[in-house]
Amino acid sequence: MRPLFVRRARQLVTLAGSSAAPLVKEKMSDLGIIENGSVWIENGTIVAVGPDDELVRRFADRLAEAEVIDAKGKTVTPGLIDPHTHLVYAGSREHEWTMRLHGATYMEIMNAGGGIHATTKATREASEEALYEESKRRLDQFLLHGVTTVEAKSGYGLSLEHEIKQLEIAKRLHDTHPVDIVSTFLGAHAVPPEWKHDPDEYVRLVIDEMIPEVSRRGLAEFNDVFCERGVFTPDQARRMLEAGKASGLTPKIHADEIEPYGGAELAAEVGAISADHLLRASDEGIRRMADGGVIGVLLPGTAFFLMTKAADARRLIDAGVPVALATDCNPGSSPTVSLPLVMSLACLHMGMTPAEAMAAATINAAHAIGRAHLVGSLEPGKKADLVIFNVPNYMQIMYYYGVNHAETVIKGGKVVVNDGKVYI
C-alpha cells in the first residue's frame, strides 16, 4: 500500500491533543487548525500532521512513491462521527409526518398504528437480506456526507430473536462496509404491543434473556434505555442499565426528551458514557452529568423535524458538560443522514458556535462511543479517517446549510468517496 500524502489544505482541522478526555467549555473552540496543512499516511494510519513545507522536507526522499491528493483551497477535517443512530430498520413513515403537519399528536399517531411499533412490525417482517440492503443504502449516504464512524442501535425488534437480527446485520455492515459501526443494544426502546399489559415482565425479559444473550454473542458494546414517562421509569431503566453493566455493556440513556424525568441524574448515577436528547433535563441533572463526565449527545435534527424547541446546548456547555452531536437517524422523528446539516441546526437552534459544532461531531462524538483513541482527530497514530470539504474554511461547512460539501472521504487511508461516488 503506497503512502498517501494529503497536501496543502487551506485549513487542516486537527483537534489534536484531545484524545484523553472530551473537550468542555472554552476548549470546545480550540480546533487545532493548521493553515496550508498536510497529512502523511502509511498503512491506514496517520504518521505525521503539520505545515506542508515541514512535511515535504521530512518525507523528501519518499515523495515519488506516495499517492498525492492536493487539497489546495479546501478544508480537511477528521472523519465525522455519528454517535446516535437507529441505522438498521425497514420501512418509512412519511404518512405520519403528514399527519403531524395536520396537527396529530404522538398518541393519535400511535393509536392509528404508527410510531415505533409501525417500524417494529416492518423490521420484524423484513428478511435479513432486505434489511441489510436497505441499511447499506443508508450507510452509503452517511459516507457520502463525510461520516466515517456510526453508532447503530437496535430497538426495532423488541424480542430476543429480532433484536439479535438487527445487531447481526449491524455487525455484517461493519464487516463489509467502509464505515465503522459501533453497536448498541436498545431492547428497552419501547414496550412491545404483546407486553403492553405487563411491562414489568418485558423488563424481566430484557434483563434475564436479551442482555445476557447479546453479551454472550459479542454483538454490542453499549446498553441503552428509553427513560420517559409512559415508556420506562427511572427504576426500570436503572435495573436494565445495571444488568447491562453486569454483562459488560456500558450504559447509555435516552433522557429527558419530553419532560424532566430524572434521566440525566440516572445517567450520572450509573456511570453512563452518554445521556442523549436532554431537551428537558433539570439543572441538577446537568450538574451531575458535568461532575460525572457524562457526555450529552444532542439531536437538533429531531427537534427540528418534530417542530419543537431544541435542547439548550449553551446551558450544557457553560455547565461543563461535554457535548456531542448526532443525527438520531430514524424513520419517525429524524429521517436524515446529514451530520453537517445537524451541525448547522446546532448553531441555528441550540446556541452553539461553528467551532463547538465541529468538535461535537468529531472528537467529542468519538468519546461518546469509546473511540477517541482511534478516531475523531488528526494526529500521529490514529486511524487515517479524513474528509476533504470543498470550502475554504470549516465554518462554511455549516454556513452553507443543506449542501453536501464533502468532496473526498478517506477511510483507513483509502479513498472511499470521490466526487459524489462511493468506492467500496
Swiss-Prot record:
Disulfide bonds: none annotated. The keyword Metal-binding applies. Its EC number is 3.5.2.7. It is an enzyme of class 3 (hydrolase). InterPro entries: Amidohydro-rel (IPR006680), HutI (IPR005920), Metal-dep_hydrolase_composite (IPR011059), Metal_Hydrolase (IPR032466). It is found in: Cytoplasm. GO terms for molecular function: imidazolonepropionase activity; iron ion binding; zinc ion binding. The keyword Secreted does not apply. One of its GO terms (cellular component) is cytoplasm. Its cofactor is Zn(2+); Fe(3+). It catalyses: 4-imidazolone-5-propanoate + H2O = N-formimidoyl-L-glutamate. Pathway: Amino-acid degradation; L-histidine degradation into L-glutamate; N-formimidoyl-L-glutamate from L-histidine: step 3/3. Binds 1 zinc or iron ion per subunit. PANTHER family: IMIDAZOLONEPROPIONASE, IMIDAZOLONEPROPIONASE-RELATED. Catalyzes the hydrolytic cleavage of the carbon-nitrogen bond in imidazolone-5-propanoate to yield N-formimidoyl-L-glutamate. It is the third step in the universal histidine degradation pathway. This is Imidazolonepropionase. The gene is hutI.
